[in-house]
Amino acid sequence: MLHIADKTFDSHLIMGTGGATSQALLEESLVASGTQLTTVAMRRHQATTSSGESIFAMLRRLEIALLPNTAGCRTARDAVLTAQLAREALDTNWVKVEVIADEHTLLPDTVELLDACELLVHDGFTVLAYTSDDPITASRLEDCGVAAVMPLGSPIGTGLGILNPHNIELICSRASVPVILDAGVGTASDATLAMELGCDGVLLASAINRAQNPVAMAKSMFHAVEAGRLAAQAGRIPQRQHAVASSSFEGLASWAEQVL
């Protein structure tokens, strides 16, 4: 179970809607992923498609909870206004907060992010904060009262995987709120590693929506997250510099040398 604030989800995979080539394919991928929570960028999404059904209506039909985000915002003020708009339009106080430093790297502006999160928490929002892989920033966000910290594995859309696994593991070991890896996942093994490092969940969009076969990739991500979670719970063996035999040498037969 994934517990965030006052909600519980069976799935540890959160899927984003960005990059989907069609709403029909997005729907198939959402179902295949098993996700119960999905992000929608308030500034970018076309509310109604040619099929006549809005993405919001589709998510309600699929019984998938909606997580609006502040993608594209460059300042704390923009993020706060976007979150307030989402609350009025969608009747939810949940928001994924993104404040981007520049359009080339899409890396978080942690100064503006901290300001935005503090204001939104004070305004009654349940905040999930997209941040860098810096453990200190993650701690500061937790001090602000966010419901989850969402460190990046690598820059958005790069598919480079987890570039600094040590920092992700450190964030997980220190956090008292859920840690959800967000951004940079390229394939199933990246999602598995995130869970093995101690993450409570994985959020991804491009890895599925821009894959050659999005539905097949969604299925693989479902199994990858579950495999990583089970491995983390099981506990890996220690890494060693020298070999350790799996079978004991005790009890081996002792053969006397025969003289010919």
From Swiss-Prot:
Top EC class for this record: transferase
Pfam families for the chain: ThiG
GO molecular function: thiazole synthase activity
UniProt organism field: Corynebacterium glutamicum (strain R)
EC code: 2.8.1.10
Reaction catalysed by this enzyme: [ThiS sulfur-carrier protein]-C-terminal-Gly-aminoethanethioate + 2-iminoacetate + 1-deoxy-D-xylulose 5-phosphate = [ThiS sulfur-carrier protein]-C-terminal Gly-Gly + 2-[(2R,5Z)-2-carboxy-4-methylthiazol-5(2H)-ylidene]ethyl phosphate + 2 H2O + H(+)
Record protein name field: Thiazole synthase
CDD domains (UniProt xref): ThiG
Name of the gene: thiG
Metabolic or biological pathway: Cofactor biosynthesis; thiamine diphosphate biosynthesis
Residues that coordinate or bind 1-deoxy-D-xylulose 5-phosphate: 157, 183-184, 205-206
SUPFAM superfamilies: ThiG-like
Lineage per the UniProt record: Bacteria, Bacillati, Actinomycetota, Actinomycetes, Mycobacteriales
Protein function: Catalyzes the rearrangement of 1-deoxy-D-xylulose 5-phosphate (DXP) to produce the thiazole phosphate moiety of thiamine. Sulfur is provided by the thiocarboxylate moiety of the carrier protein ThiS. In vitro, sulfur can be provided by H(2)S.
